[in-house]
Amino acid sequence: MRRAAHQIHDERPLVFDDPFALKILPADAREEIRRTPAASRKPFSAAMRSFMVCRARFAEDVLAAGVREHAIRQALILGAGLDTFGLRNPYPGLHVFEVDHPATQSWKRKLLADAKLDLPESLSFVPVDFERQSLRQQLLHAGFDFSIPTATAWLGVVPYLTLEAFAATARVLGRLPRGSSVVFDYSLPREALSPIEQLMLDSLSARVAQAGEPFQLFFTPESLPEELSCYDLSVAEDVDSAALNARYLASRSDGLHLRGRAGHLCHAAISSNGARQ
């Protein structure tokens, strides 16, 4: 919804241009976005949208660099939700694998069918029930090749995981060959925030907990490298709000701006010598 609102309510040039963000939504959701421009300008909404569009742009910038510099030929989108990169993929020879819970993926595929959006042959859907199925085995079953350099986007997922669940997926990603990348977002722990940011985190935490998806996992830029090293991953870039503002939101007059320091984006590289079986 926030990516879609960005397409119609924010000034040009867009931070993240996604022509399918509105098309994939149900008609009532599209109409709600169009008729409530004032809602998108509220501080909380603008702040959340700012982070989400910067996050998406950053992940696709890392992918683009990987295609140029490391011959990336697979894109893996974990917790894909309504991500539309598989429909927009501009890179010949790049295959996109979308991973999500079976129920969520079924819902998305119905939306795609309702919108009469054609699915390219370069897109594969991989349903995974993480409580009962192996991510690695489901990927292999779908034709994923662990010997091919891959760009992974793992967005909007990590803060909701237990450390055990994070580790299980990170181990799978650490088996990818050198040249592969993993982009994910994470949040600083409450004690690392200013008093006003703690209040904001408390409010947001209450919202997501009420929705049944509480925040569970936090890192700091100091603790993350050691954690990733356990899975043959290393931090290539850790980007905070100030860096995202400078990179993507400078000189804008539409209210898109990141405040505080809670949200970070991590671009992780593979530190092993190649794919392991």
Show which residues each predicted segment covers.
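Rossmann-like AdoMet
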Residues: 1-76, 80-126, 146
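Rossmann-like AdoMet/SAM-dependent catalytic core
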Residues: 21, 195-277
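Short coil/turn segments at beta-strand junctions that form active-site/ligand-binding loops
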Residues: 70-74, 146-149, 178-180, 262
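Conserved beta-strand signature within the Rossmann-like core of class I S-adenosyl-L-methionine
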Residues: 151, 170-191
